[in-house]
């Protein structure tokens, strides 16, 4: 769910924000009447200094980054390798470091871990990992154990490497076919891809599916998130961009990146990279 605002100021005229109805509040845990959000688990979070888009030499490696509010990084369990032990969902929380929500699990042996929250999971639900796990929302198992047509997320590229694929808000892949040793998945991009049957995935769709409907409404909200302005190349000087300079407006060139490479239509995939695991390309 999301909420719109009355246009009482220019910044709220286009503003669309998530309603955060799925999140657990402090009042849910304490019984008091409060809408304050749950604080992150201290042992599973730490302060991570912002790079400001710079590499280890201080050079800009990613443009348009810098500033923004400080963030606590939450340690997420992408491997889901604690097998055979049931866990209870303590809370569903906001994470400023990703578009999806996260869920805090309390295992039967007392250990706590954060995972990506599947869509529809709520406080008090039970989840479990490993072979023989029930086919239930939030449970994790290998791809070979899942029936055809299953909706999955947080998928490993190689066994025991931890989830790498389908982790953003609202995404899900589908199990399409099984062959000896491999499972074919339909990815959110439309690509059909083969993966080792020993790779793990979590059942369900990633939470916060309305994330793509949100509108920041003003430049200042982008700055709070650590996003700096984007300047057009034609507004720069020739020393700064291939499009820079010229008396007045000039557009008699092929569009290029700030580093001089053709920016439209140029293939960037390494020709030596194998395509044998891609059954159907997303572009076809």
Swiss-Prot record:
The keyword Transmembrane does not apply. One of its GO terms (biological process) is cytoplasmic translation. Residues 264-284 have a biased composition (Basic residues). Keywords: Ribonucleoprotein, Ribosomal protein, RNA-binding, rRNA-binding. Residues 232-284 are annotated as: Disordered. The keyword Transcription regulation does not apply. InterPro entries: NA-bd_OB-fold, Rib_uL2_dom2, Ribosomal_uL2, Ribosomal_uL2_bac/org-type, Ribosomal_uL2_C, Ribosomal_uL2_CS, Ribosomal_uL2_dom3, Ribosomal_uL2_RNA-bd_dom. GO terms for cellular component: large ribosomal subunit. Pfam families: Ribosomal_L2 (PF00181), Ribosomal_L2_C (PF03947). GO terms for molecular function: rRNA binding; structural constituent of ribosome; transferase activity. SUPFAM superfamilies: Nucleic acid-binding proteins (SSF50249), Translation proteins SH3-like domain (SSF50104). Residues 240-250 have a biased composition (Basic and acidic residues). Coiled coil: none annotated. HAMAP family: Ribosomal_uL2_B (MF_01320_B). Part of the 50S ribosomal subunit. Forms a bridge to the 30S subunit in the 70S ribosome. Belongs to the universal ribosomal protein uL2 family. One of the primary rRNA binding proteins. Required for association of the 30S and 50S subunits to form the 70S ribosome, for tRNA binding and peptide bond formation. It has been suggested to have peptidyltransferase activity; this is somewhat controversial. Makes several contacts with the 16S rRNA in the 70S ribosome. NCBIfam families: rplB_bact. This is Large ribosomal subunit protein uL2. It comes from Chlamydia felis (strain Fe/C-56).
């Amino acid at each position: 769910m999301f909420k719109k605002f009355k246009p009482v100021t220019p910044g709220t005229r286009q503003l669309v924000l998530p309603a955060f109805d799925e999140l657990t509040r402090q009042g849910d845990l304490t019984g008091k009447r409060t809408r304050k959000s749950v604080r992150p688990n201290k042992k599973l979070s730490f302060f991570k200094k912002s790079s400001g888009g710079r590499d280890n030499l201080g050079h800009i490696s990613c443009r348009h980054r810098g500033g923004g509010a400080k963030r606590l990084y939450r340690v997420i369990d992408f491997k889901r390798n604690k097998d055979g032990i049931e866990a209870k969902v303590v809370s569903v929380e906001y994470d400023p470091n990703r578009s999806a929500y996260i869920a805090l699990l309390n295992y039967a042996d007392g250990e706590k871990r954060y995972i990506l929250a599947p869509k529809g999971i709520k406080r008090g639900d039970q989840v479990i990992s490993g072979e023989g796990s029930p086919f239930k929302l939030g449970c994790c198992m290998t791809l070979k154990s899942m029936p055809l047509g299953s909706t999955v997320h947080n998928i490993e590229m190689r066994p025991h490497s931890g989830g790498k694929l389908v982790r953003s808000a609202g995404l899900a892949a589908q199990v399409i076919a099984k062959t000896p040793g491999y499972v074919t998945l339909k990815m959110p991009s439309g690509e059909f891809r083969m993966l080792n049957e020993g790779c793990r995935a979590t059942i369900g769709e990633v939470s916060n599916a309305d994330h793509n409907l949100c509108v920041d409404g003003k430049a200042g909200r982008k700055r709070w998130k650590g996003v700096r302005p984007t300047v057009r190349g034609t507004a720069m000087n020739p020393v700064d961009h291939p499009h820079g300079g010229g008396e007045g407006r000039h557009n008699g060139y092929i569009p290029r990146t700030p580093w001089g490479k053709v920016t439209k239509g140029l293939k960037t995939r390494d020709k030596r990279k194998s395509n044998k695991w891609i059954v159907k390309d997303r572009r076809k």
